[in-house]
């Protein structure tokens, strides 16, 4: 029953809805021209009225216009009555409406101006919000800064503290501060304040570097050197090779300052002090270097792309440079002249080289050529001066008979001091002052040479002496040519005796002196040959008497055995076995007389030349 009752109601509602749709369509068709469809659809009363009309009968429809007219007239009359009764209200309403209209215009204008100003106001608000946020952020930062005031102050005072540590030599604390600043830089490198602190700390580190290197330029001991190099390594500004170079440069500057301060007026004093300072301080520097740096091969090979540096070559090159500089100074001072101290100077230099052998820098082998050059140069200079003095004496010499000469008829009998094995000068030279002075000067040169007389100079010394004797021979011949025409028979005999003494006494005596300086056995042992074969190597250690005799042969008397005895006397000495070294080397005694003044024949006693 319930279901049967529900179905008709649904059908009725559907039929009503369909009816309304049809009415609306019909009304739309009828009043298309009078009422737009949108208008009556929007006004419910119009639609309701039209639907009411559509449901009225014909009679009502006929009376409807009249009713509407009457209702209209009635409404108009009511409106008039209302207007008449309330005209003041309408007037006030109109005035109010007009005023409101004006006010609305003002409001509209104000709103327009407001709308025009709103964008700038909006931007100002944004700026205000931004500034407020910045102020708030700054306030927070200021609050945080105030809370961290102590920590910030400590950071800001790092440059001042770093400078104080460096200037007061608190290098350990300075390195800790530098490490802390490097960590700050890695974390906060974008902060300008941190960058400023880093720059100031770098300046202090540069000052610290200068101070440390300056300490190496002073008389610093090994413990202090170790500390300084440790600081430099921790600063990490040099590679290992650069650090070695810096160390050697600084220590070399200190050593050069010491050597430069030595007075240079006296060559012997200068070179002795130079040897002492170089030996002591160079040894200290080498000891310091070896204690600080290791020349062992690295445990790890160098990384790819890295240049391999031979660090040990740095040190050895520096040592070679120092040795070369010392040898240059030594040779310079030796050539300037050191008097008779060549032997003591050689001993000091040898001790210097021996001390360096403990550090692998023995340079004694380089000393021999230096002393040889100086010794032969000094000897050659002395020989040259001797020849020049002989030339001066011969220019003013006059042949005057002397008792020693005139009282003897046999010349060899008057020469008892020229027997083999003796070093006493021939006394017969006293009768001829130029020859005596010449021999004296030669013996002085020999005595100076004896202090430092290496076997290697045998040939050079012999050659220099032969050249000097050859020049003396030429001087004698020049004297003969100049004076021969004015010679008397006595003067001619004296001149012959002069030449005979020169060749038979002076030259053989010089040969014996050469054999004392350069023993033939020692020369043969040095050459590694028997003494009997020494003559095959030329005139080593003896003068060629025949070469000197030849220019004077036309003056001398015809005697075939003039030099036979002397050559036989020299022969055993050249071939004798090497003697045992004496406790003290025999000394070459010069001839007694001094050179005469004004060419007088009288001779005066002269003290013998004494070697140092």
Swiss-Prot record:
Family: Belongs to the COG8 family.
Keywords for the protein's UniProt record, in alphabetical order: Congenital disorder of glycosylation, Golgi apparatus, Membrane, Protein transport, Transport
Disordered as annotated region, ranges: 568-612
Protein name: Conserved oligomeric Golgi complex subunit 8
Described function: Required for normal Golgi function.
Assembly mode: Component of the conserved oligomeric Golgi complex which is composed of eight different subunits and is required for normal Golgi morphology and localization.
Membrane topology type: Peripheral membrane protein
TM helices/strands, residue ranges: none
Signal sequence segment: none
An annotated GO cellular component: Golgi apparatus
Pfam families: Dor1
Family annotation (InterPro entries): COG8, COG8_Metazoal_Plant, Cullin_repeat-like_dom_sf
GO BP term, pick one: glycosylation
Superkingdom to which the source organism belongs: Eukaryota
Species whose genome carries this gene: Homo sapiens
Disulfide bonds, paired cysteine numbers: none
Pathology linked to this chain's protein: Congenital disorder of glycosylation 2H: CDGs are a family of severe inherited diseases caused by a defect in protein N-glycosylation. They are characterized by under-glycosylated serum proteins. These multisystem disorders present with a wide variety of clinical features, such as disorders of the nervous system development, psychomotor retardation, dysmorphic features, hypotonia, coagulation disorders, and immunodeficiency. The broad spectrum of features reflects the critical role of N-glycoproteins during embryonic development, differentiation, and maintenance of cell functions.
Subcellular location(s) of the protein: Golgi apparatus membrane
Main subcellular location of this protein, as a coarse class: Golgi
